A protein has these predicted regions:
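Mature extracytoplasmic or organellar-lumen-exposed domains after removal of signal/transit peptides
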Residues: 1-178
């Protein structure tokens, strides 16, 4: 899908080792193995699993990007109304991407329903109950740490390196003028 392709490109440094390259490699592997079915059935399964995991990782990287943005905007000494609005927009995007995992059948994703729900709670957007996302604006000194916890948990779940977590701060399309 074209919309998700943009998110993939935003998280990819275009250095031949990112999400796009991994997805391309595994789509080619999947296509080749399906042409030689059933001889390459295991390869098709491996490629399919790798594609799904990579797409899941892109989603997690996008959540991390939005969490970084919220922390950056609301950590300012005097955030403007525009900063606050942009932070709440970014938070809403992160919540939406995280909530999207709940649409997957349990067992088909690396992240568990419990982990999703715990992180939605941290974002003040519980599955059951009243959302209180405004607290990130009204009480940033106590609330922003929760977004760092979300980042840390996603890092652990998906095995992201410290460098990747830093890289997820950036929109690589903008950075590289692509």
């Amino acid at each position: 899908d074209a919309f998700f392709a943009v998110y993939i490109a935003r998280r990819d440094k275009n250095d031949g080792s990112g999400f796009y390259t991994e997805l391309k490699k595994n789509y080619i592997k999947l296509q080749a193995s399906l042409k030689h079915n059933p001889v390459m059935k295991n390869e098709a399964s491996e490629a399919s699993d790798a594609i799904l995991l990579n797409l899941e990782k892109v989603n997690a990287a996008t959540i991390i990007n939005y969490c970084h943005l919220v922390v950056s905007l609301l950590s300012k000494t005097n955030p403007t109304e525009s900063d606050k609005a942009n932070a709440l927009h970014a938070l809403s995007e992160a919540i939406g991407f995280l909530h999207g995992y709940r649409l997957l059948n349990p067992g088909f994703s690396r992240i568990t329903t419990e982990q999703i729900d715990r992180n939605l709670e941290r974002m003040n957007a519980p599955v059951q109950g009243q959302a209180a996302c405004y607290r990130f604006v009204t009480q940033p000194e106590t609330e922003l740490v929760k977004l760092q916890q979300v980042i840390s948990e996603l890092k652990s779940i998906y095995g992201f390196s410290d460098q990747q977590i830093e890289d997820f701060r950036k929109n690589w399309i903008t950075e590289q003028g692509r």
